[in-house]
Amino acid sequence: MLRVDAISTFYGETQVLFGPSLSVGSGEIVALLGANGAGKTTLLRSILGLTPPRSGVISFDGAAITSKATHEIARMGIGWVPDDRRVFPSLSVARNLQLGFKKTRFRNWTLNEMFGIFSPLEHLMARDCENLSGGEMQMVAISRALLGSPGLVLFDEPSQGLAPKIVQDVMRTIRRLKNEGIAALVVEQNALAALDVADRVYVMGRGRIAYEGPAADLRSDMALRTKLIGV
């Protein structure tokens, strides 16, 4: 579904990504781990066209997207849940969700299904997002991404700043995507939580892929896990 082949990405004249390659299959959950500054968020930004790579190829659903604009990539079926949620604070929850609605060739979600996943949402619809807690904002951000009918969702630090109960709900939602045939690429500092839901894992270091393998292998091998990600 998603292929990233040997991309090089720069901020100005500073190179940040040095040829990482990865893939995410249809309905597959893939974790992308690594220390702060390893290049994980830049890789997501490259996929989304926000920081386009200078070389290499990115393809989605069989089509090259390396040179496409971000809005075109979204219309093709890639959703994004950024680390800062990026809800519109002065707009209501209902309006924020309405802005996410799109139809693609992938599964189309309904608002009632979002209420089934995040039950508090139904009672927050009239509230402005600036009055929400961090956990409530994350519910809005994830729901908005799903209402865009993606075949793939990119999650950037989905558990950041959330209470443990909300983290469980978020990870349960990511796991559910697999059952719905939706793929996910999950950047996450909470490595154990990510490994619990992922099928495969990549570990980045200094803009390169340092490790690739089944998530269960890294989860069960404490020595390797400590060496690669320090947990």
Annotate each language-model stretch with its function.
Residues 128-132, 136:
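Conserved ABC ATPase signature
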Residues 2, 17-19:
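Conserved structural motif at the start of ABC-family nucleotide-binding domains
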Residues 145-146:
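ABC ATPase C-loop
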Residues 153-157:
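Catalytic Walker B motif of ABC-type/P-loop ATPase nucleotide-binding domains
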Residues 33-35:
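The feature captures the beta-strand-to-loop junction immediately N-terminal to the Walker
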Residues 56-65, 76, 109-110:
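Conserved ABC transporter NBD signature motif
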Residues 48:
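Helix-to-loop junction immediately C-terminal to a conserved catalytic motif
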